[in-house]
């Protein structure tokens, strides 16, 4: 995870910058949502002395947006950190600036069990020198799941749901505590026992210090005389006691509620991502978690 770029706005002979991200302990990912992102900014002086006024890290996400012209793609900077500055970098010298910053709780998950989910996250380093600012190339950022996120995705995989895709949607989900200007959707193919009722299920995690909001949306199948429609609901879970819960049973209950209890949703209300969701479910089931790491469509039978 290294990028290097000559700071062109400073002219030939300007300083160069390398930013190296550390892997989180016990994980191949750089960090998890709400966790620390650590690393080092390596600076190498150019042909003359430069006053480094500010070193800034910017978190970037590639998002999709629905517009009148159709689906558009673009990038969003969703967090900035000043990690150094206020010193002179002498010609031809090197300096290392270590940093430790905290990712937003709603930072999307970009990989599961080391496998990329297909979304683009990155860190961009900006150097402010003598009134000029120059941004480096995007350094890929790998973000793994929180324990509760991993447990829920693993349970969905054990139930027979398969991973299809993941993307970042620009906009806000009504009725939630969403903070970022976009949200992640993880699209799953239905488990065999639900294939008659839904075409796919989409999962969105909105993490916060106390736990997760889990938004489930089902693209329901229509019959010969009834159109299909979207059904959705929201659940909340804590970051605590993740290992002691029977996640397969709990998540299966969520899906059953989504498919069965929300079946009439499309007949009396229109759906949009700006409409409030139904009340959350706070169910808790004590049980044994077998620790088998499968995840949706990743190694499941």
Give a label for each model feature.
Residues 1-275, 282, 297:
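N-terminal onset of structured domains
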Residues 277, 281-301:
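Short, low-complexity, glycine-enriched hydrophobic/amphipathic alpha-helices that associate
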């Amino acid at each position: 995870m290294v990028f290097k770029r000559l700071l062109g706005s400073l002219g030939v002979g300007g300083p160069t910058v390398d930013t190296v991200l550390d892997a989180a302990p016990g994980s191949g990912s750089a960090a998890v949502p709400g966790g620390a992102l650590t690393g080092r900014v390596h600076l190498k002086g150019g042909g003359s002395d430069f006053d480094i006024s500010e070193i800034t890290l910017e978190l970037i996400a590639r998002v999709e947006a629905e517009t009148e012209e159709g689906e558009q793609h673009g990038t969003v900077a969703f967090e900035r950190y000043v990690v150094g500055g206020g010193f002179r970098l002498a010609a031809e010298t090197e300096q290392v600036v270590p940093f430790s910053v905290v990712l937003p709780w709603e930072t999307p998950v970009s990989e599961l069990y080391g496998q990329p989910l297909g979304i683009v996250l990155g860190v961009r380093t900006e150097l402010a020198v003598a009134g000029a600012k120059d941004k480096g190339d995007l350094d890929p950022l790998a973000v793994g799941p929180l324990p509760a996120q991993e447990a829920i995705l693993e349970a969905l995989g054990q139930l027979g749901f398969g991973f299809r895709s993941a993307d970042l949607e620009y906009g806000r989900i009504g009725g939630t505590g969403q903070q970022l200007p976009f949200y992640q959707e993880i699209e799953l193919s239905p488990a065999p026992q639900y294939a008659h009722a839904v075409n796919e299920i989409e999962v969105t995690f909105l993490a916060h210090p106390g736990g997760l909001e889990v938004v489930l949306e089902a693209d329901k199948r229509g019959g010969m005389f009834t159109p299909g429609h979207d059904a959705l609901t929201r659940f909340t879970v804590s970051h605590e006691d993740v290992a002691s819960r029977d996640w397969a049973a709990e998540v299966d209950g969520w899906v059953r509620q989504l498919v069965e209890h929300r079946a009439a949703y499309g007949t009396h209300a229109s759906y949009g991502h700006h409409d409030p969701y139904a009340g959350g479910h706070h169910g808790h089931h004590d049980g044994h978690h077998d620790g088998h790491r499968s995840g949706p469509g990743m190694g499941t039978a």
